[in-house]
Design a protein with these regions (language model features):
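Active-site core of PLP-dependent enzymes with the aminotransferase class I/II
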Residues: 215-221, 233-259
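Glycine-rich loop-to-alpha-helix module at the N-terminal edge of alpha/beta enzyme cores
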Residues: 79-161
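Active-site-adjacent loop/helix segments that line or gate small-molecule/cofactor pockets in enzymes
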Residues: 9, 15-66
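PLP-dependent enzyme catalytic core of the Aspartate aminotransferase-like
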Residues: 1-12, 339-341, 349, 400-460
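Active-site PLP attachment segment
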Residues: 280-312, 323-330
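PLP-dependent aspartate aminotransferase-fold enzymes
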Residues: 123-230
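Structural signature of PLP-dependent enzymes
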Residues: 334-359
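Conserved PLP-binding catalytic core of the aspartate aminotransferase-like
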Residues: 352-355, 362-395, 445-460
């Protein structure tokens, strides 16, 4: 056979040594599948934040076959520890939590959908109000983007006003992207610079007015010069609120009969049991939750005061799959486990430890570093010209060591000390290499493929 021939007459094969292998010969199943996906799916996948170009172009495994705890297996069977974004923040309790999955399996066996409503939607509404006593009513959906859109529809219906003052990222819908109509730089600090709102009706122009986080004077000016009906913002993302900032926002809303909405899709249940606003003692008129609420299962919620929420009845907000049973069932069990294990305390402590150890590592190799974000959503930045190349190098080298890693860690309860120690053991050598590159070594010679794309930019 061929192998025997090669062993007995190696000279026959010498000519092949100079032949370059076909493009993709070294690609795994995931990389090849993504090439097919780009021909079939606009953008290649369903979520910008999961595109391989955001991590490691041409090298990222892209697809998973299994996920458990804080581990992920790709289509080639390779096992990785996820020290990255954990499903984009969906799994505080880790992937495939047994109690949550068992609860879901039970309702799948009993039936997920029927002509009747599922009782779990009532139980979940009661639970969310119990956790947030300021709220009176609840509407459920299945994604954060649609829950944010629902909250805006309800608030506009309640106030009879179109204009929204906003800060931060709130999804892909027309109401939000309309901020870029006429001036495509408006969202530069919130979304991707240069975002074009094609497909968004032009008559929405002027309905969205952005302000920077911790800049109360900007919000005051907007309210003074426009007939604002809604203030929409994240409680916190990358920096802490200045003393009096959230209280000032609340006062402006109250004094001007404006509905205040806190978007807790990302921040919820990470530093408190419930919305992050509980930490600061400032209650909104409405709050929006998603991501961690179902530990990987699709569920979102809009909670609010009765005076505002009853405006839902004056408009039309309705969807068939908001009545399925898996989402609220998963949420109820997730909340039960979170409360019992005090998950928010654990992931906050772990995140603070990771941030401190990044700082120590940077100091060891005399690298500048900026650490930001909620403790459980901690991230770092090395503010130098080659940062995107270094970020790519981190992902590339850590992937070889069996880690999904970049410059952000969305912490889960499965990130135990032994895993964190192993992560830093391997990250040490990458920081050393970055230090060498800052001293003159050529980082381009170390990269096996293209540089990763820049991520989101926001005004908070």
């Amino acid at each position: 056979d061929v192998l025997e021939l090669k062993q007995s007459h190696p000279e026959y094969f010498e000519a092949n040594k100079g032949i370059k292998r076909n493009e993709g010969a070294d690609f795994g199943i995931g990389q090849k599948l993504y090439k097919r996906a780009k021909k079939l799916i606009p953008g290649g996948n369903m979520l910008l934040s999961k595109r391989p170009d955001m991590f490691l172009p041409d090298q990222w495994p892209s697809y998973f076959s299994k996920a458990k705890g804080c581990k992920v297996w790709d289509l080639d069977g390779n096992e990785y520890i996820d020290m990255s974004i954990m499903g984009i923040g969906t799994n505080i309790l880790g992937y495939g939590h047994p109690e949550v999955d068992d609860a879901v399996r039970k309702v799948v066996e009993q039936g997920n959908m029927s002509t009747f409503n599922c009782p779990e939607e009532v139980y979940l509404a009661e639970r969310l109000i119990e956790i947030h006593p300021w709220a009176d009513m609840v509407r459920l959906a299945r994604t954060g983007g649609e829950a944010n859109a629902i909250s805006i529809r309800i608030a506009r219906a309640a106030t009879g006003k179109d204009k929204v003052a906003f800060c931060g990222y709130h999804g892909w819908h027309d109401w939000y992207l309309s901020a870029n109509l006429g001036d495509d730089s408006t969202l530069d600090g919130h979304l991707l610079p240069g975002l074009e709102p094609k497909g968004v009706p032009q008559n929405l122009k002027g309905t969205m007015l952005p302000f920077n986080y911790n800049k109360i004077e900007e919000l005051e000016a907007i309210v003074a010069n426009h007939d604002i009906g809604v203030i929409k913002m994240e409680v916190s993302r990358n920096v802490e609120p200045k003393d009096g900032f959230l209280e000032g926002v609340r006062k402006i809303a109250t004094d001007n009969n404006i509905v205040l909405i806190f978007d807790e899709c990302t921040s919820g249940f990470r530093q408190t049991f419930g919305g992050l606003h509980k930490k600061y003692g400032v209650s909104p008129d409405m709050a929006v939750f998603s991501k961690a609420l179902g530990n990987g299962y699709a569920i979102s919620a809009v909670i609010g005061i009765q005076e505002v929420m009853e405006a839902t009845q004056s408009t039309f907000i309705s969807s068939t799959f908001w009545t399925e049973r898996i989402g609220p069932t998963a949420a109820l069990k997730t909340l039960e486990v979170m409360e019992r294990e005090k998950s928010w305390e654990r992931i906050t402590a772990t995140g603070k430890d990771i941030g401190k150890r990044w700082q120590v590592l940077a100091e060891k190799y005399m690298l500048p570093i900026e650490i930001s974000g909620l403790p459980a959503l901690v991230n770092f930045n090395i503010p130098v010209d080659n940062w995107l190349k270094y970020k790519t190098l981190i992902t590339q080298e850590m992937l070889k060591k069996g880690f999904l890693a970049s410059n952000s860690v969305y912490v889960c309860t499965e990130h135990i000390n032994a895993i964190i120690d192993k992560y830093f053991e391997h990250l040490d050598s990458v920081f050393e290499t970055i230090s060498d590159c800052e001293d003159g070594r050529n980082v381009d010679d170390l990269l096996d493929g293209p540089v990763c794309h820049a991520g989101f930019k926001r005004l908070n």
